[in-house]
Amino acid sequence: MAYDGFVNYTISKELSPCIIGGKIDSIFEPNNNEIIIGIYNNSSKYALDIVTSSNNYRVCLTQNKKVNPTFAPNFCMVLRKHLLNTRITNLYTLSLERIMIIEFEGHSKSENIGKKKIIIELMGKHSNIILVDSCDVIIDALKHFNNDENSYRSIISGSKYTLPLSSKHDFINLQDEKIFYEDCLNYSKEYNTEKLTDILSNLYTGFSKTLISCLLEKIYIEDFLSENNTSQAMQWSFRP
């Protein structure tokens, strides 16, 4: 299954009971695409694995033991300074975007840090882990980008964090079946395609083509645009 916005949202809901309220007791960076955060919560220990590899990005709990470098990389040291001994107060996604946010509060070993957040962007080769303060000012990031490398935002220490640009619609806030169909119809005409897998994956956040194909197969409708098909897809997606 592709790691799309729906998967990211579901994983956040599964992780929350395990790690919200937990105390950060270790942070490691076994390689330049991965951070592992040790969490103690409800008399249990958890290892939160955050991977930003372009072809296998994910957030999950792990029991795998990784070999860590003798000397911790700079970003790992920054995370330890700001997050060790704090507690996780919240974990959530931004709608169905592939962005997960973890909030921390408390005292680190060196100072009263107040509130901090890590923003996990799971977007292929652009995947990143960004540490920000309570005002969303970037403290540090696993990967840095300046205006020369990225025309619309900088990921460097001291700059204000801004969300990645997205032209897609928010599927969660969609309420009207007629508007849903009209949006799909307009896209179909503009890009000359009637395949729902193409239309939904390019028009709305959260959908991968793999997920759409599974959905269509589950509700026994074919992969083409019609008002009946979009109505059934929307009703199934929002059912309790």
Where on the chain are the PLM-derived regions?
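Amphipathic, interaction-prone secondary-structure segments
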Residues: 34-41
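Short Lys/Arg-enriched alpha/beta "domain-start" segment
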Residues: 2-15, 66
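Glycine-centered C-terminal helix-capping/turn motifs at helix ends
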Residues: 20-21, 85
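Residue-level recognition of beta-strand termini and adjacent short loop/turns
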Residues: 31-33, 95-96
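Phosphate/anion-contacting hairpin/loop surfaces
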Residues: 3, 43-240
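Intrinsically disordered, low-complexity boundary segments flanking structured domains
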Residues: 10-15, 36, 74-78
